[in-house]
Design a protein with these regions (language model features):
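A membrane-interface helix-boundary motif in multi-pass transporters
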Residues: 177-207
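12-transmembrane solute porter fold
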Residues: 13-182
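Short, charged low-complexity intrinsically disordered segments located at boundaries
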Residues: 3, 37, 81-82, 186-190, ...
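C-terminal membrane-cytosol helix-exit motif in multi-pass small-molecule transporters
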Residues: 1-11
Length: 207
């Protein structure tokens, strides 16, 4: 399908996507950045609730409150970016990437004893970073494009954001599932009917 799409775009007078879009350097760089943005922005909202519910036993109401902290962070971020955009959009992009990276590093340190306030703080930080990055990224990507190309450019721009999210969510879920099975297999190797732990039914039940 990709080959047919490329051949069609290169040979027809009326291609599905106007190739002139990709001659704009700002837009091309913006596509790469929005792809990365999609990867980093949505994945935690899929993975964190699973961890909180299945591994830590949080009720649904608490998980909803902790996820709402990210939305509060985005609201705060939009107020911040309104001031940054008056100076230089690139400052907002750099600041947003830094905030998202910091929140990702913070979430990488999570364990089963993590405090709910730590989860909320990571969500707020990611929300602020997402908002601060999104607005200037959109401004810079479309800054030098002709107005007549905006409809096509917008569709591609948001398609790549969703594409990045879909790919990274799939990879993340696959990685968690695979590593979980590997860890379980490594633990199960040391347990059999002949090991000492088998003499304690309560421990076997926990296993």
């Amino acid at each position: 399908a990709l080959w047919v799409f490329l051949v069609h775009s290169a040979t027809t007078n009326n291609p599905f996507i106007n190739p002139h879009l990709f001659r704009d350097r700002n837009f091309t760089i913006g596509l790469a950045l929005v792809f990365i943005y999609g990867m980093l922005n949505i994945t935690p909202t899929v993975m964190i609730p699973t961890m909180l519910q299945n591994l830590m036993g949080y009720p649904d109401s608490m998980i909803g409150i902790l996820l709402a902290a990210r939305g509060a962070g985005m609201v705060l971020g939009f107020f911040i970016v309104a001031q940054i955009a008056k100076v230089d959009p690139r400052i907002g992009m750099i600041s947003g990437v830094a905030a998202i990276g910091l929140s990702g590093w913070y979430m990488a340190l999570f364990n089963l004893q993590v405090d709910p306030w730590a989860v909320a703080l990571a969500g707020i930080l990611q929300g602020v970073g997402s908002a601060v990055m999104w607005v200037p990224l959109s401004i810079v990507a479309f800054a030098t494009l002709p107005v007549k190309l905006y409809p096509e450019a917008s569709s591609i721009f948001h398609l790549l954001r969703n594409f990045g999210s879909s790919i990274f969510i799939s990879v993340s879920v696959l990685t968690v599932s695979r590593t979980g099975k590997i860890s379980y297999s490594e633990l199960a190797e040391n347990v059999s009917a002949f090991t000492d732990i088998a003499r304690y039914p309560q421990l076997m039940g926990l296993w």
